């Protein structure tokens, strides 16, 4: 059953919504017009034309004061602006770093020959080796007061070397690093599968199989075959004895 006879409910709802929107729009327009029509209030701080005499009187009184006189407010501001005298000691600027001088090092070899080298405190042990022994830095060992200088990244300044100090230098003849020795009681393992160690057990197994066939099937083995088998057995026994002899 429809709300209005002859008119669908959808049309009725649409016109109702449009009517509500129209009423709201008219109400908003009327409110905006009423707010825009109100006169702006005049600020209270703005001087009115009726007060020129008071302003002129105040200006004349300020001009009549002595030029050297200061108001209490200005005097207070001047005192606040003056810096307070410091009571502590004045900070002295840090002295500039003294320039570093190069180190003079005496490299002493095993044959009592010496070589003078100059280096900076920030240079490392590795850079000293590369400079004095180019291409042989891996073969050079430096010793200072019985201590091996093995850390190539250590700087010379961290060692606190005195002037004209002596560094004992040992030059090795080997190019590569030596292989670490095997601990006692241990032997190096085989690098891979050794076929020679398996050949002799296979031959022994084959020899046992032939002797088994010779005993079980004697008619098939003539005298020459038996003698050949015996000679092969003797040869294989001598070979096994030579290989496994302590």
Curated annotation (Swiss-Prot):
Region annotation Disordered: where it falls in the sequence: 34-101
Tissue expression summary: Ubiquitously expressed with highest levels in mammary and thyroid glands, bone marrow and spleen; limited expression in cardiac, pancreatic and ovarian tissues.
Gene name of the record: TMUB1
Domain of life: Eukaryota
Name of the protein in its database record: Transmembrane and ubiquitin-like domain-containing protein 1
Lineage: Eukaryota, Metazoa, Chordata, Craniata, Vertebrata
PANTHER family from the UniProt entry: PROTEIN C7ORF21, TRANSMEMBRANE AND UBIQUITIN-LIKE DOMAIN-CONTAINING PROTEIN 1
Recorded topology in the membrane: Multi-pass membrane protein
Assembly with partners or alone: Interacts with EEF1A1, GRIA2, GRIP1, CAMLG, TUBG1. Interacts with NPM1 and CDKN2A; TMUB1 can enhance interaction between NPM1 and CDKN2A and is proposed to bridge the proteins; proposed to be mediated by iHOPS. Interacts with ERLIN2 and AMFR; TMUB1 promotes the interaction of ERLIN2 with AMFR.
């Amino acid at each position: 059953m429809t709300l209005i006879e002859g008119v669908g409910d959808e049309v009725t709802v649409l016109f109702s919504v449009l009517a509500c929107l129209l009423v709201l729009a008219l109400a908003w327009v009327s409110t905006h017009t009423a707010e825009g029509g109100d006169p702006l209030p005049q600020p209270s701080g703005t001087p009115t034309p009726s007060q020129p005499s008071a302003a002129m009187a105040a200006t004349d009184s300020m001009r009549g004061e002595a030029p050297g006189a200061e108001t209490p407010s200005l005097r207070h501001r001047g005192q606040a602006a003056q810096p307070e005298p410091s009571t502590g000691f004045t900070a002295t600027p840090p002295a500039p770093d003294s320039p570093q001088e190069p180190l003079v090092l005496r490299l002493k070899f095993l044959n009592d020959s010496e070589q003078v080298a100059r280096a900076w405190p920030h240079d490392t042990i590795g850079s000293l080796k590369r400079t004095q022994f180019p291409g042989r830095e891996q073969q050079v060992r430096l010793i200072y007061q019985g201590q091996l200088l093995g850390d190539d990244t250590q700087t010379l300044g961290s060692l606190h070397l005195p002037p004209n100090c002596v560094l004992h230098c040992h030059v090795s003849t080997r190019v590569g690093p030596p292989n670490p020795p095997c601990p006692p009681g241990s032997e190096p393992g085989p690098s891979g599968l050794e076929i020679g160690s398996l050949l002799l057990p296979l031959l022994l197994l084959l020899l046992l199989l032939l002797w088994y066939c010779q005993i079980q099937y004697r008619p098939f083995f003539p005298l020459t075959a038996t003698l050949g088998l015996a000679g092969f057995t003797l040869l294989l026994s001598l070979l096994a004895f030579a290989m496994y002899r302590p």
